[in-house]
Amino acid sequence: MSKIFVDACFGKETPYTPVWMMRQAGRYLPEYMRVRAEAGNFLNLCHDPKKACEVTLQPVDIVGVDAAILFSDILVVPLEMGMDLKFVTGEGPKFDDPIKNEADLDRLFGGDEAASKLTYVYDTIKLIKEQLAEDKALIGFTGAPWTLATYMIEGEGTKTYNICKKMMYSNPKLLHKILSKVTEVVKFYMEKQIEAGIDVVQIFDSWAAAIEPSKYDEFSWKYMVEIADYLKAKYPHIPIIMFPKGIPAFLDKVYGNFEVFGVDWSTPMDLAKEKLGERYVLQGNMEPCRLYSKEETTESVESIQKIMGGKRHIFNLGHGILPDVPVENAKHFIKECHRVSKK
């Protein structure tokens, strides 16, 4: 059975424009909160294939999205490379011993050795595929090497990225070594996700906007493209979505062998279409806070549909759904995307 979502990724004609939401398996769903409470904490949930499978499937069953996205976290990659990851309540993820020099980097596992430790992710994928409806796609994902490296170097989330940027400008050789090592792990990681059964790959560069546009290709995009090239050579039937958040200034310079470009909410959809619409399918890009109002949601969905015309497009939010959004409003978003695009 063909999957509408996969067809849309390849720019094929579909009966309506498919839709999913970043962070769709998340805290706005009471059912998710129940499973997370049973798991004890977020990381336990990521490590438990049965529970991770359950929360992956929840938004498909409850909200009606056209694709499931694997429930996991981008930081399982540095965790299995050998870094000590903790999630601190109210503060987010922390690494106790961030990378300061080459010796710190050399201590970490690389390539297939690190990727082979992520068996709980691959087991989760296999469980999901057993239970996911045949017409629904499963999206696997990874953080981009730059986004992963920011946590590995800073030790936690940051607003300034000054430790990373100090390295970028004063010791770029070391930063490139870190990015290269992470890239090799991610290649094997995504390959193993594909072998386990995912239908689509998304690469999240959540902190793309931390890099000045003239340096973005050198320190992030080229590594994302390297991963895409590696996967495309082996798995041409698996579409790849690139999502660099918050860099409209880079639209003119986008290149690479992938199918879908994720547009965040700060980039006007008509601008993205003008710059990239002929080369790539576009995904996005409703402002997530519009979900607080059904009227605002309808207005945005209709506006995006008018720009895209139901062609070479996947509906999504321009970032993740927020925890206090009413479930009814999320359902309304999905229904409206289907309504306005039905052919």
Swiss-Prot record:
InterPro entries: UROD/MetE-like_sf (IPR038071), Uroporphyrinogen_deCO2ase_HemE (IPR006361), Uroporphyrinogen_deCOase (IPR000257)
Single GO cellular component term: cytosol
EC number: 4.1.1.37
UniProt cross-references to Pfam families, sorted A to Z: URO-D (PF01208)
Gene3D superfamilies in the record: 3.20.20.210
Major place of residence: cytoplasm
Keywords: Cytoplasm, Decarboxylase, Lyase, Porphyrin biosynthesis
Domain of life: Bacteria
Catalytic activity: uroporphyrinogen III + 4 H(+) = coproporphyrinogen III + 4 CO2
Pathway: Porphyrin-containing compound metabolism; protoporphyrin-IX biosynthesis; coproporphyrinogen-III from 5-aminolevulinate: step 4/4
Compartments, record wording: Cytoplasm
Residues noted as binding substrate in the record, renumbered to the chain: R23, Q24, A25, G26, R27, D73, Y151, S206, H319
Site (Transition state stabilizer): D73
Main EC class the enzyme belongs to: lyase
Covalent S-S links between cysteines: none
GO molecular function terms noted in the UniProt entry: uroporphyrinogen decarboxylase activity
HAMAP family according to UniProt: URO_D (MF_00218)
Subunit structure: Homodimer.
Functional summary from the UniProt entry: Catalyzes the decarboxylation of four acetate groups of uroporphyrinogen-III to yield coproporphyrinogen-III.
Full protein name: Uroporphyrinogen decarboxylase
Species: Sulfurimonas denitrificans (strain ATCC 33889 / DSM 1251) (Thiomicrospira denitrificans (strain ATCC 33889 / DSM 1251))
